[in-house]
Amino acid sequence: MKSAILVFPGINRERDMARALQLASGSEPAMVWHADTELPKGTDLVVVPGGFSYGDYLRCGAIAARAPVMDAVRKFASDGGLVLGVCNGFQILCESGLLPGVLMRNARLKFICHDVHLRVERSDTPFTRGYNAGQVIRVPVAHGEGNYEADEETLQRLEGDGRVLYRYCSASGEVGEAHNINGAAASIAGIVSERGNVLGMMPHPENHVEAIMGCTDGRGLFAGLVEHLAKAA
């Protein structure tokens, strides 16, 4: 798997993501600077990592979405390439038009930084094939603006098309207000594009891939991507 990680000023999770991808694929990802206008030839996966691109000025992800490299990412996605955006990366994908909706301030207006439980809603996508449908996984979050919102028509379309891949839940998989950490509509933690090739999620699976981290539940996402791309080759 040949992956490329975008790097913007203020991003701080690119090395964590590189470690997770390297462990899963055995290949070192390429780092792509925000001012570049092309992706490396043969790229299979583009990752937009977490952090605080451009200091979160204007809106989270708003400036990064207009960086030169994003034109290449939009073209890559329109051609069917796989794109993963995590935390600030999710915000950037929404701001760039690759995903619908917006990430708002957390409902309690506080920065959240701890492990959460997610329910995997389906297992037949490149981003979830490493899990079972209904499986509960534990991954960290670290955000102040992770409250996913969209208009009612968009939310109905996301639900009807099965495009919600991850939801906040309890340790036993129960979804509800008590387990919705940031107030996100329908407890949404991660969604995919219409074609299913672009995923945005607020939690950080890359931070739970080694036993020394206390949990390895994030491995499934990366292992599934490697398996999908190997079969598609």
UniProtKB/Swiss-Prot annotation:
Part of the FGAM synthase complex composed of 1 PurL, 1 PurQ and 2 PurS subunits. One of its GO terms (biological process) is 'de novo' IMP biosynthetic process. The lineage of its organism: Bacteria, Pseudomonadati, Pseudomonadota, Alphaproteobacteria, Hyphomicrobiales. It comes from the Bacteria. It is found in: Cytoplasm. Transmembrane segments: none annotated. Gene3D superfamilies: 3.40.50.880. GO terms for molecular function: ATP binding; glutaminase activity; phosphoribosylformylglycinamidine synthase activity. Residues 3-233 form the Glutamine amidotransferase type-1 domain. PROSITE patterns: GATASE_TYPE_1 (PS51273). It comes from Rhodopseudomonas palustris (strain BisB18). NCBIfam families: FGAM_synth_I (TIGR01737), PRK03619.1 (NF002957). This is Phosphoribosylformylglycinamidine synthase subunit PurQ. The active site is at 87 (nucleophile), 204, 206. InterPro entries: Class_I_gatase-like, PRibForGlyAmidine_synth_PurQ. Pathway: Purine metabolism; IMP biosynthesis via de novo pathway; 5-amino-1-(5-phospho-D-ribosyl)imidazole from N(2)-formyl-N(1)-(5-phospho-D-ribosyl)glycinamide: step 1/2.
